[in-house]
Amino acid sequence: MNAIWIAVVAVSLLGLAFGAILGYASRRFAVEDDPVVEKIDEILPQSQCGQCGYPGCRPYAEAIGSQGEKINRCAPGGEAVMLKIATLLNVDPQPIDGDEQEVAPVRMLAVIDENNCIGCTKCIQACPVDAIVGATRAMHTVMSDLCTGCNLCVDPCPTQCIELRPVAETPDSWKWDLNTIPVRIIPVEQHA
């Protein structure tokens, strides 16, 4: 019985000593993160889709913050994310990457053909934002409010029952295309 207490005390003291050493080392060798990169990372949609050319949102935020990467490469975030980053960095807004005009790209949404879905859950596993719901061997569906249109769920589907479709314009998603509105200047008569 006495040997058990000695072992318990010895292991407890070793745990306490190693915990103190790890605590000291974590403070001594801590790497400070750039607060601007943290703020940019919070703005990005965290879909980890890779459409920007980086493996995820954090590497893209680091590239913007420290390497001066363009702020207009996040397709799922679109114009709203680009404008927030431009405001944060105090730079001029840029057109969304791939667009030479100032028109925002059409938002895409994954749609599952539920008649052909076999319930394999491969699309659920591939979705970075958990926008697809369903169970094994049951049909799946996409929650349109959460889907970023990143296209990561399309390739894993063995029955090819997922496709991306443009989101229909609603009063919430519709925007004026000011470049297509014809403007005619009418001269004003000056009275003498």
From Swiss-Prot:
Region (Hydrophobic): 1-26
GO cellular component term of the entry, any: plasma membrane
Record bears the keyword Iron: yes
PANTHER family linked to this entry: ION-TRANSLOCATING OXIDOREDUCTASE COMPLEX SUBUNIT B (PTHR43560:SF1)
Assembly behavior: The complex is composed of six subunits: RnfA, RnfB, RnfC, RnfD, RnfE and RnfG.
Listed name of the protein: Ion-translocating oxidoreductase complex subunit B
Domain 4Fe-4S ferredoxin-type residues, every copy: 108-137, 138-167
EC number: 7.-.-.-
Organism: Citrobacter koseri (strain ATCC BAA-895 / CDC 4225-83 / SGSC4696)
UniProt KW keywords: 4Fe-4S, Cell inner membrane, Cell membrane, Electron transport, Iron, Iron-sulfur, Membrane, Metal-binding, Repeat, Translocase, Transport
PROSITE patterns registered for this protein in UniProt: 4FE4S, 4FE4S_FER_1, 4FE4S_FER_2
Residues at which [4Fe-4S] cluster 1 binds: 49, 52, 57, 74
